[in-house]
Regions:
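Glycine-rich active-site loop/strand segments that organize a redox cofactor
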Residues: 37-90
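A secondary-structure boundary/capping signal
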Residues: 11-14, 36, 107, 147
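N-terminal Rossmann-like FAD-binding beta1-loop-alpha1 element of flavoenzymes
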Residues: 6-33
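Short glycine-/acidic-enriched loop or helix-start segments at secondary-structure transitions
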Residues: 20, 43, 116, 161-163
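Conserved Rossmann-like nucleotide-cofactor binding loop
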Residues: 16, 39, 157
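Extreme N-terminal leader/targeting segments of oxidoreductases
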Residues: 1-8, 26, 123-125, 158-165
Length: 165
């Protein structure tokens, strides 16, 4: 168990972000999952009708499976090929609801900046010991949260490559 009171921030509540949160829980760390969308897997839902090219057995992280099974979750057929919607409904939503993750999930929290608190690019002495200051935008405005580490699982869905790039 880690005695650091600050959480580890995970940016994004898609498959990778929630798997990271589950792994943090397994290792005794507190996650703080910051999702820009209004639901877990928000980017996945935008292509929810598309069938994923890998079966369920390759899409469920071991630490996530452990948390889910403790809550009574029954895994889908490992050889089946889910759609994006299936992935959200049968895996991400139940994972986000487990008691080890649910209280640490913040929907509608768009991360706009990550820095070391009290430091800029020119100031380096002591930087490694400073917490991360994460600026988030919500419907209520801008705020700052602190974390001891940051995992960026925000994905690339919001950063498309233009034609010809």
């Amino acid at each position: 168990m880690n005695n650091d009171p600050l959480p580890v921030a995970v940016i994004g509540a898609g498959p990778v972000g929630l798997a990271a949160a589950a792994e943090l829980v397994k290792r005794g760390a507190t996650p703080l999952v910051l999702e820009a969308g209004d639901a877990v897997g928000a980017a996945v839902l935008r292509w929810g009708h598309v069938r994923i090219f890998s079966p369920w057995k390759y899409n469920i992280a071991p630490a996530a499976r452990d948390l889910l099974e403790r809550s009574g979750w029954v895994a889908p057929d490992g050889d089946g090929y889910p759609t994006g919607r299936d992935l959200v409904d049968a895996y991400l939503t139940p994972l986000a609801a487990v008691p080890e993750i649910a209280p640490h999930l913040r929907l509608g929290h768009r991360v706009t900046r990550v820095t070391r608190r009290g430091f800029d690019k020119m100031k380096t002495a002591g930087r490694d010991d400073a917490p991360f200051a994460i600026t988030v935008e919500t419907n209520d405005g801008e705020s700052e949260v602190l974390a001891r580490a940051v995992i960026d699982a925000s994905g690339t869905y919001g950063l498309p490559n233009p034609i010809g790039a």
